[in-house]
From Swiss-Prot:
GO terms for biological process: mycothiol biosynthetic process. GO terms for molecular function: acetylglucosaminyltransferase activity; D-inositol-3-phosphate glycosyltransferase activity; magnesium ion binding. Homodimer. The keyword Nucleotide-binding does not apply. UDP-N-acetyl-alpha-D-glucosamine binds at residues 27-28, 35, 241, 246, 299, 321, 329. This is D-inositol 3-phosphate glycosyltransferase.
Length: 439
């Protein structure tokens, strides 16, 4: 359940956020960029508006990445050089964690000792770095997994690659070491307990948010005109990374059974989908529906609004989804959602009220559910969709994040009453080294 605001201990003044494998500045829908990127950036921006300074550490991926990007007052992104810019994918990054950690520690050394109040790591790779930073800086570590290897491997799409064993080992270490664990839903909390023996008292449920100022209902005809779509067509959209996990092929196969439906796909290949980036286009040809499928590249937030508004339905057929930010964004635009009944999607979508949930990935079931929603008239769900999405504001998310941070700081001080003394000794050593004398 959500944290009450009266559970908030001393709020942090400065937060170090770790996002090793993907930059919050990357375009969602490309490479490894997705909902996590949105979460990291938007939570930082909204915390900064409350006077909390946030520094986000991520791995530089091109030589053109500046060392520091000031995104907004109170929000910095530090691009840490760790390994070659080209030729590394997410599964190679464990070999670069030492280099990344060194870059983080060097950046921290430019500040006065005790600069950060807390470390928040996102994804298990960042958790490995956060574990060391926590011990070096004598501050608590809060960790958000976003996805778990065991959960993904239990629901693999056909032809998808399983997560390697080393990831499960790394995740277990971070779960054991983190001072608090933040999850998107109650189900994810249960999975941490059952799969990783996490202490339930250290877990906080914090739902991701949606930008309710950007994602709003609007004129469908205007949105379709901007995208070159026929205003008379029935449109079902898919938004996200093109990879087996996200299952866009399920939507195409279902659409092949629905001759009056146009499919709109917005996103780029990612993960194992990079091995055959044109597979989805080839599938549309094979199914004989290529004339009814429109492919768009990954969209900016402003352009994404048009996609949601243009659609009669948005489909989220993922095999695994810790929350499903696309589903909430679509509903905020007044568009009902048909989604797989997996992970956090039953929280993001109210079955029968703001859309529909489908058990499993049988193409016939998906076609039937889409047809039923379209026959019922998606417009009847629009108001409920907007009202439901309004409960997922970033303001609510940051309320709960800061409450979790406050509790982490309070608990850490209780468990480590001499943390300030430890920090003072390290401070003395640091200044002594700078002066060239022994402490």
């Amino acid at each position: 359940m959500r944290l009450a605001t009266d559970q908030l201990g001393r709020p942090p003044q400065r937060v170090a956020v770790l996002s090793v494998h993907t930059s919050p500045l990357a375009q969602p829908g490309t490479g490894d960029a997705g909902g996590m990127n949105v979460y990291v950036l938007q939570s930082a921006l909204h915390m900064a508006r409350r006077g909390v300074e946030v520094e986000i550490f991520t791995r530089a991926t091109t030589s053109a990445d500046p060392p520091v990007v000031r995104v907004a007052p109170g929000v910095l992104v530090r691009n840490v050089v760790a390994g070659p810019f080209e030729g590394l994918d997410k599964y190679d990054l464990p070999t670069q964690l030492c280099a990344f950690t060194a870059g983080v520690l060097r950046a921290e050394a430019t500040h006065e000792p005790g600069y950060y109040d807390i470390v928040h790591s996102h994804y298990w790779l960042s958790g490995q770095v956060g574990w060391l930073a926590r011990d070096r800086w004598a501050v608590p570590l809060v960790h958000t997994a976003h996805t778990l290897a065991a959960v993904k491997n239990a629901a693999l799409a056909e032809g998808d690659s399983p997560e390697p064993p080393l990831r499960a080992v790394g995740e277990q270490q971070v779960v054991d070491e983190a001072d608090r664990l933040i999850v998107n839903t109650e189900l994810e909390a249960e999975q941490l307990v059952s799969l990783h023996n996490a202490d339930p008292s250290r877990i906080d449920v914090v739902h991701p948010g949606v930008d309710l100022d950007t994602f709003t209902p609007g004129d469908q005809a205007a949105a379709r005109a901007a995208l070159g779509l026929d205003p008379r067509e029935t449109v079902v959209a898919f938004v996200g990374r093109i990879q087996p996990l996200k299952a866009p092929d399920i939507l195409l196969r279902a659409a092949a059974k629905l001759p009056d439906v146009r499919v709109l796909v917005a996103g780029g290949p990612s993960g194992s989908g990079l091995a055959a980036p044109d597979n989805l286009v080839a599938l549309a040809d094979e199914l004989g529906i290529s004339e009814r499928v429109t492919f768009l590249p990954p969209q900016s937030r402003e352009d994404l609004v048009r996609v949601y508004r243009a659609a009669d339905l948005v489909a989220v057929p993922s095999y695994s989804e810790s929350f499903g930010l696309v589903a909430v964004e679509a509903q905020a635009c007044g568009t009902p959602v048909v989604a797989a009944a997996v992970g956090g999607l039953p929280v993001a979508v109210r079955d029968g009220v703001t859309g529909a949930l489908v058990d499993g990935h049988d193409v016939g079931d998906w076609a039937h559910t889409i047809d039923s929603l379209l026959s019922r008239g998606p417009a009847t769900m629009r108001r409920a969709a907007v009202e439901h999405a309004a409960t997922f504001s970033w303001a609510h998310t940051v309320d709960d994040l800061l409450a979790s941070y406050g509790r982490a700081i309070s608990d850490y001080r209780d468990r480590h009453p001499h943390a300030d003394e430890t920090l003072s000794r390290r401070t003395a050593r640091r200044f002594s080294r700078r002066r060239g004398v022994r402490a």
